[in-house]
Amino acid sequence: MKLLRMIFLVLIVSACSSPKADSPATAKQEFAQFTKMAETLDNEFMDESRNFLTENGHLTGDKAQKSALKWLKEIDSKQIQKMNSLQIKDPQVNRLRTLFIQNRLDTEKAVENDGYAKKPSAKAMEINQKIERNKTEYRQLFDTLKKKYPL
């Protein structure tokens, strides 16, 4: 598990240090690719979550949490691989991808630490705050790029 997270961290760091895009046209194409991929992955996630709830809605307590966490890790792993398959050179678009991936990993941590419980632990609250900061940065950067490169 720790090895997998370290691999993801290395991928994220290497993605963050990639060179600048060749031209604004390339950055616009990369932003369009990212947007399409993010939308596709979000739609897949929603479909898969409906299927998961249909199949596992009867579970409760620890069994439900363990099952949900296992499912979440599987789908996140697939989605992170797909997102990392994009060839992105533009640093701003790359930052969006990094935030997208980080949100997936932090959500897993929040689920592991009962972050979505009625009374989350201090660690879970810290993770939730990080998720909110990243979401805010993601939305702001996405809006900036959307104005810069209209779709």
Predicted regions and their residues:
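Sec-dependent signal peptide recognition
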Residues: 2-9
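C-terminal motif of bacterial Sec signal peptides marking the signal peptidase cleavage site
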Residues: 12-15
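Hydrophobic alpha-helical core bundles mediating ligand binding, dimerization, or RNAP-core interactions
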Residues: 31, 35-49, 76-79, 100, ...
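Soluble, cytosolic/nucleoplasmic coiled-coil alpha-helices used as oligomeric scaffolds and tethers
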Residues: 51, 58, 89-92, 96, ...
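N-terminal hydrophobic targeting signals that begin at the initiator methionine
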Residues: 1-2, 17
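Long, amphipathic, charge-rich alpha-helical segments that form helical bundles/coiled-coils
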Residues: 68-131
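Short, low-complexity, Pro/Ser/Thr/Gly-rich segments in the mature regions of secreted, periplasmic
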Residues: 134-151
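Immediate post-signal-peptide N-terminus of mature secreted/exported proteins
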Residues: 17-70, 147-151
